[in-house]
């Protein structure tokens, strides 16, 4: 049965990010493509059920893009109206100990604010790129996203590789497109390589071309939509 009528909706922008942040007690990825194996085990244990992909209550509590989108599809939302949300920023944490810096490490709270976003617990991809020499990047193979560590600072974010994987998922599921939050925290100066690398990674996969957004000083936040 359809969860609700989508007849009068042009599109459904699914905000599949902010799955973890400084409100948690441990480090976690901002926008994982897939669930972490330990996360699914802990949820199953807490619900007293054996985990499998057909347990709807467990899947509703999993914090990852693939499960989230599949829930929308299973409830009857048309794939052609669903846009997968992607973030051009990361969620950061201050570790309790720099010696324990993996996924699920205990934290003392939000990470240090960046010079532009100026919000503890958030770093734009552009800010991460500006400090790239200070960070040690790790690839989270389970969840298909990176995280980086700098002393007692930890950030889970997206890079060109993970954004490309998510864009391929959009194609594989025949979704309507993708949306990002938001263009001003992409690497618009090209410090990590080409300008707007995340934006262009999406567009390259979905449309086979790159884009160069025009600057608009009056617009602080922009959401871009791709079909």
Can you describe what each PLM-predicted range is?
Residues 1-128:
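Substrate-binding surface in catalytic domains of secreted glycosidases
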Residues 46-53, 71, 149-157, 170, ...:
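Short flexible/disordered coil segments
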Residues 55, 131, 205:
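Residues that form generic nucleotide/phosphate-binding pockets
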Residues 91-95, 99, 152, 159-222, ...:
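Acidic/aromatic/glycine-rich contiguous surface patches that form carbohydrate-binding/processing clefts
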Residues 114-175:
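Hydrophobic, secondary-structure "cap" segments at the distal end of domains
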